[in-house]
Amino acid sequence: MKKSLMALIVVGSFLLSACALRPDTIVNTPLTARPQAASTIAPPANGAIFQAAAYRPMFEDRRARLIGDTITIVINEKSSAGKQAGSAASKTGSVTASAPNVFGLLGSLTNRLSASGSNAIKYEDKGAVTSSNNFISTMTVTVIDVLSNGNLIVAGEKQVSLDKGSEFIRFSGVVDPSTVNSGNIVSSTQVADAKIEYRTNSTVDGAEVASMLARFFLSVLPL
């Protein structure tokens, strides 16, 4: 009795935790970064007016350039694809046979002994597949690294908790600073190597995992 009760408790704990599962991700980079600590060594003075270490353009807004800066990504992704395939094949054949006439003997009889046949095979196959996706959202990501050419590696995650679960929007990619608009805004279509995903851990996803766990434990319970 105690073993059965403990097994039921274990099953119940898995069922409750299934709803809080964090879905897997295709974004394999850190999702945020903190600004680098200021150096205690004074940067070299490489000019009387222009200082590369503290350069900020005079006639433009403050733009993301350093690790820890933020950029707003406007996600507007649309994709559609279609594929059609078809094949056809046919084959026909015929055969005739007759009995030989041996030295003219039994000619009248063998002329009547003949056979013929024909066959036809036809095959045709057609298929079509279409797919269409539309993803529109806005999120702010963090610069996690700066490449040697000045391009920015950005990544971030946005979580939205709803009544029956949580939604996860994750993003990563490489941003060319010249494509960043006023207000530190860039379109997702201008981000290189972009990885965009939308996942949930709603009760539907949790129910699928819970169902598998329940079947496993119920199969070993002495009920």
Curated annotation (Swiss-Prot):
What GO biological process terms are annotated to this protein in UniProt? bacterial-type flagellum-dependent cell motility
- Quaternary assembly: The basal body constitutes a major portion of the flagellar organelle and consists of four rings (L,P,S, and M) mounted on a central rod.
- Per the record's keyword annotation, is Transit peptide included, yes or no? no
Gene expressing this chain: flgH
**Chief location of this protein?**
membrane
Q: Which GO terms describe its molecular function?
A: cytoskeletal motor activity
Would you identify the family this protein belongs to, as annotated?
A: Belongs to the FlgH family.
Annotated lipid attachment (S-diacylglycerol cysteine): C19
Claim: Membrane is one of the keywords in the record: yes
Protein name (database record): Flagellar L-ring protein
Which keywords appear in this protein's UniProt record, sorted alphabetically?
Answer: Bacterial flagellum, Cell outer membrane, Lipoprotein, Membrane, Palmitate, Signal
UniProt membrane topology term? Lipid-anchor
What InterPro entries does UniProt report for this protein, alphabetically?
Flag_Lring
Residues with lipid group (N-palmitoyl cysteine): C19
Q: Name one Pfam family in it.
A: FlgH
| Signal peptide, first to last residue | 1-18
Q: What does this protein do?
A: Assembles around the rod to form the L-ring and probably protects the motor/basal body from shearing forces during rotation.
Gene Ontology terms: cellular component: bacterial-type flagellum basal body, distal rod, L ring; cell outer membrane
Q: Could you name the domain of life of the organism this protein comes from? A: Bacteria
Quote the subcellular location field of this record. Answer: Cell outer membrane; Bacterial flagellum basal body
